């Protein structure tokens, strides 16, 4: 079923900036797995790469066909990761690329003037119709890149044995991300900048708050400033229990909107009660509920979340994490249908 509606990014902007109740309930997701997109579109996009003909046409149509006002999009840094099964798994020690200063010096760092493949943003900019904007940024944030390049254990040991090396890796990654957002922020087709960077798990952050303040948040602050300098809001997607650092994220980094919520940590409705006057929550419907609930129960659950979060207009409907390859497409469509029906 097509959920196409007249796209209007200005309505999503009202949500992000908390500047007025939008005319419709916007939708937002940080990520959709290639398998989910393939199932929804009836294509083989899950077997395609960014540079394959038609890839971005399918990707853009996927979001527009579900009633989105924006195209969520991220491209990774040109920083090679260790090859092998599980190379993208956080903290895979056997695939760590930087264990010492020699590794750091020999690593093929990209030129800071061209740290990502910007041409993909140019391609999507030509595909989007009037009323639609890209919400874009770098795939993975400073914590995720550093923990993958060094390995979680390797980084942890280095914090004690070789803190200067940890400083250098975080500084380099931060500079590359900052350079990217400095350029993306000037693109007319981009309506907001975003960063995904999973900082924690169910009970706490991976790094102590003081280490996040030392290594991670300075980069957040710089890239948020780039967004604001260009009159654009900034979205942070970060999983985990971040209660110890929400004040840093909101007041120091000045992030405009937060995505990624889990009922077991803090339901999005509770987050809105505590922080909603200072930052906009996005999404938050529990992925497990979406995957397992009957359609009737799922529609009721969706209505409950809308009532809890959209009463003032400052929220966008979506999952608490992402569109996974194991999520039934029809269940997610039921969520969006309910969002359109309840708020039309």
Question: What residue spans do the PLM features occupy?
Answer:
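Active-site loop segments of alpha/beta catalytic cores
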Residues: 1-37, 41-48, 52-58, 69-73, ...
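Conserved alpha-helical segments that form or flank metal/cofactor-binding pockets of metalloenzymes
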Residues: 76-83
